[in-house]
């Protein structure tokens, strides 16, 4: 995924009310940016962190800047949760994810389950359907270990139940965890943060849902999938 325009470097002053961040632009001007992330952003919201912003071309937009990347522990981290679906969809379309290759069509945001939308629906007259849910991962608390979630996510647990229901109905279902940082090579569920989600994933896996963990290379020019991470128990 390429950013449509060059990102703007800035310095994070504070993140607050979940969807807002005060930043300092290169010329010292203060601005407020939109934060497209409903989680806590644990470990990547420290005041003084270098950040990168996109700027909307829409002059009517109240907040023209959006927080895209944060530098944490010496590495770039993608914090915009609107991007993972597109990143994975582009990689699938390009045949860059062997585990999700071989389907004739790809559709995004298709209604299914209990008033939900599946992130990606892959369909093929021979292979059948694959329901693919994508989660953004940015949490790292120790070593080269990425974790999800960074806060309790009842919505995420609901998605696991719906994926298991798709398997029961005869379809394939895949939970993709997209690690938007380059300093991790292993992944696990943060059971201490959300034990219910951890239990839900175990049940989903037992019922045939697949888990796929993909890592990204990030630059201010774009974000692309470059590796598969090991899922740790």
From Swiss-Prot:
GO molecular function ontology, one term from the record: DNA binding
Pfam families: SfsA, SfsA_N
InterPro entries from the UniProt entry: SfsA, SfsA_C, SfsA_N
Family: Belongs to the SfsA family.
UniProt name for this protein: Sugar fermentation stimulation protein homolog
């Amino acid at each position: 995924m390429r950013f449509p325009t060059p990102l703007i470097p800035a310095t994070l002053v504070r993140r607050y009310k979940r969807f807002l961040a005060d930043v300092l632009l290169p010329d010292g001007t203060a601005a407020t940016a939109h934060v497209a992330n409903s989680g806590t952003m644990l470990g990547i919201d420290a005041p003084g962190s270098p950040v990168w912003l996109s700027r909307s071309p829409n002059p009517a937009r109240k907040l023209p800047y959006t927080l895209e990347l944060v530098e944490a522990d010496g590495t770039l981290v993608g914090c915009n949760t609107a991007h993972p679906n597109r990143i994975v969809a582009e990689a699938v379309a390009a045949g860059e994810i062997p585990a999700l290759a071989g389907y004739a069509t790809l559709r995004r945001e298709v209604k299914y389950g209990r008033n939900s939308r599946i992130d990606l629906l892959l369909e093929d007259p021979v292979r059948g359907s694959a329901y693919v849910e994508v989660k953004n991962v940015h949490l790292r608390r120790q070593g080269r270990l990425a974790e999800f979630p960074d806060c309790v996510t009842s919505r995420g647990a609901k998605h696991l139940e719906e994926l298991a229901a798709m398997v029961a109905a005869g379809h394939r279902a895949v939970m993709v965890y997209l690690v938007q940082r380059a300093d991790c090579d292993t992944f696990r569920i943060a059971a201490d943060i959300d034990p219910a989600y951890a239990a839900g994933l175990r049940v989903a896996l037992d019922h045939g849902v697949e888990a796929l963990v993909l890592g990204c290379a990030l630059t201010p020019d774009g974000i692309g999938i470059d590796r598969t991470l090991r899922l740790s128990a």
